[in-house]
């Protein structure tokens, strides 16, 4: 089958850059092997749910915070994980927002939430889940690096 005749599942997700001074909020999730993965607050969109609505919902569950004044930063899209059982077409929105509330995650996969200095974010996000997971793809983290440097683009092909 040629790549032109394949149908890939579509994975839609949204993540939010929450900033406090020179710190970025990251969530800590425990992987199946017991290791800790640091990621941006956010996650998968439900069928029919906009990326903006998914961002608001997921941030509330993963952090306990309420986001307001959601602002679009970037869209990442393209084929991912080619040749693996998780192969998909990804459509990921990145936003920033104002927020209020207390850090109190209710997502059972989240074991912690922490403010991380910008200078330390890149070191933490280099380590993640197994290679078959999209978060391991280094292109997923290029927009975060660019955002922290004040160089975010609106579109990132992956």
Q: Where are each of the predicted segments found?
A:
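Conserved N-terminal beta-strand and adjoining loop/helix that marks the start
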Residues: 1-25, 44
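Residue-level preference for beta-strand/loop junctions
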Residues: 10, 36, 89-91
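Active-site beta-strand termini and strand-to-loop segments that position acidic
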Residues: 18-21, 29, 96-98
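Conserved Nudix-box catalytic region and its N-terminal flanking loop in Nudix hydrolases
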Residues: 23-61
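Nudix hydrolase/Nudix homology domain
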Residues: 33-38, 108-158
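Unchanged
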Residues: 45-68, 78-131
């Amino acid at each position: 089958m040629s790549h032109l005749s394949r149908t890939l599942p579509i994975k839609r997700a949204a993540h939010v850059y929450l900033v406090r001074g020179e710190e970025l909020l990251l969530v800590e999730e425990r992987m199946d092997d017991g290791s800790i993965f640091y990621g941006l607050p956010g996650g998968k969109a439900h069928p029919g749910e906009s990326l903006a609505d998914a961002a608001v919902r997921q941030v509330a569950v993963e952090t306990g915070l309420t986001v307001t004044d959601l602002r679009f930063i970037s869209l990442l899209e393209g084929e991912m994980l080619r040749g693996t059982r998780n192969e998909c077409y990804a459509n990921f929105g990145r936003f920033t927002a104002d927020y209020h509330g207390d850090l109190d995650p209710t997502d059972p996969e989240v074991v912690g939430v922490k403010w991380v200095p910008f200078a330390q974010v890149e070191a933490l996000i280099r380590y993640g889940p197994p290679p078959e997971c999209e978060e391991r793809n280094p292109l997923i983290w290029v927009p975060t690096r660019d955002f922290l440097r004040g160089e975010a683009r609106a579109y990132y092909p992956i």
